[in-house]
């Protein structure tokens, strides 16, 4: 019986800088509620970014301590362009939970 091998890490084609990972903050009514009550912040992120990439980018750019990162891949919506049906691009969202002593001020 052979030993179970751990999975090999996935090699990425490109390395992303912190400012390339976080594309923009998502400021919505629900996001502002999360920021004030639960100390959680939402960002639109690069589609190839991992949770570890997002954690390092937020800690580097905002000088805060990240406890948890949750990610979602959102499907693009169907949109009409005159008489043709098109689609918007798929995008990725991250919800970042911070340590209770830390805040991001622009929300």
From Swiss-Prot:
TM ranges: none
Protein keywords: Ribonucleoprotein, Ribosomal protein, RNA-binding, rRNA-binding
S-S pairs: none
Top-rank lineage group of the source organism: Bacteria
Record has Ubl conjugation as a keyword: no
GO molecular function, one term: structural constituent of ribosome
Pfam families to which the protein is assigned, alphabetical: Ribosomal_L23
Described function: One of the early assembly proteins it binds 23S rRNA. One of the proteins that surrounds the polypeptide exit tunnel on the outside of the ribosome. Forms the main docking site for trigger factor binding to the ribosome.
Subunit relationships: Part of the 50S ribosomal subunit. Contacts protein L29, and trigger factor when it is bound to the ribosome.
Name of the protein in its database record: Large ribosomal subunit protein uL23
The encoding gene: rplW
């Amino acid at each position: 019986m052979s030993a179970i091998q751990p999975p090999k890490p996935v090699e990425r084609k490109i390395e992303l800088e912190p400012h390339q990972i976080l594309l923009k903050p998502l400021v919505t009514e629900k996001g502002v509620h999360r920021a004030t009550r639960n100390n959680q912040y939402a960002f639109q992120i690069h589609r190839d970014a991992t949770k570890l990439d997002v954690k390092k980018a937020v800690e580097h750019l905002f000088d805060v301590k990240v406890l948890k990162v949750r990610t979602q891949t959102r499907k693009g919506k169907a949109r009409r362009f005159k008489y043709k049906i098109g689609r918007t691009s798929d995008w990725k969202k991250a919800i970042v939970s911070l340590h209770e002593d830390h805040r991001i001020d622009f929300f």
